[in-house]
């Protein structure tokens, strides 16, 4: 653990600690690494201690971009479109699930029906929010959208049945908005 590593670094007055496994060098741990681990103990890391990385992709050139991102080591792909409850998004999601072994989050949506359709197509996570923020005009231009708190509750009602996490995307202007989103069931 980190306490043992700190002890070895101090004892030998060194700044880098080689990490060995089966007689082979697997990495180095520095005092800065230990400080980061202590400062952000809840950071989302993979089994090698690296921060997890997600990358957004759209519906154009989806497979090519996804292939490059997955080969670079991305942990999650986010199929990110303004209004994700559409045939093209469902089709791209199915293609991604058939070709890659990473989690795929899909959004943005605002209804229980969208949640059900995307989960059944393979979504591992959902992003909720169509036009709830000041910079997004999707709801105004398209006429499609639901107030953020209602959208979260509607999507969570379905996602919970499948064990799929929900992320509130937008509409979080004041500290109380985050509390409301979590209270409505967003992860």
Where are these predicted regions, by residue range?
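Glycine-rich beta-to-alpha transition loops that act as phosphate-gripper elements at the mouths
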Residues: 1, 20, 55-61, 105-114, ...
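Short beta-strand/loop segments at the ligand-binding rim of alpha/beta enzyme cores
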Residues: 46-55, 95-110, 125, 158-170
